[in-house]
Amino acid sequence: MKHRYLKSNLIACLLTATITGGCLFTSCEDWTDPEEVDYTIQDPSEQNPELSARYIESLRVYKLERPHYITYASFNNGIEPSKNEGDYIRSLPDSLDFVTLANSENITTADREDIPELQEKSTRVLYHVDYAKKMAELPDEAALGAWLDKAVSTVAKLKMDGFAFSGIPLYGGTDIEQAARKASARLIVSKLSATGKALVFEGDPSFVDAAD
């Protein structure tokens, strides 16, 4: 009698486990049914055009009309197509007043597409004229002038907002070398300022004479 009771209990337990397992299996199948998800990224102006327009206007008023501390950054642009959003200039904070494209001689298609987006938010985008890095490759004023003309042409074509340039003063050397370095600085300032666009210097200010 005792053995029959144990056998009945065992059968009942097995039936219960089978039924429960079947339910769980069915539930899992329901959960793993494929479902199409829309991952289309909408621009804020498409989600709420009125709110977006008000936000853009508030940025313009703040940056161009109200006294505030200027925020300035340099961005290492020119990265090949990347899955990392942080590699694109469109990922920069809206609060920036100026951003210099560090690799301005390698402005990619993505950079070209993103520049107007930054400008819409009143962020001014500058071309980097890195004379401190390139001066060894520019032995005379003719070579320097041609290089500067290319920068001016690019800024005009892409409707950028100006230039940031760098230079290193000559602390020693002969009078001729000193004069050549000063002439280079004058040519840079003259060419870039003639555009009427923003002009920022990065480096030791003694590279540029106050009169220039």
Over which residues does each language-model region extend?
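Bacterial Sec-dependent N-terminal signal peptides
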Residues: 1-8, 17-65
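Chitinase-like catalytic core of GlcNAc-active glycosidases
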Residues: 66-212
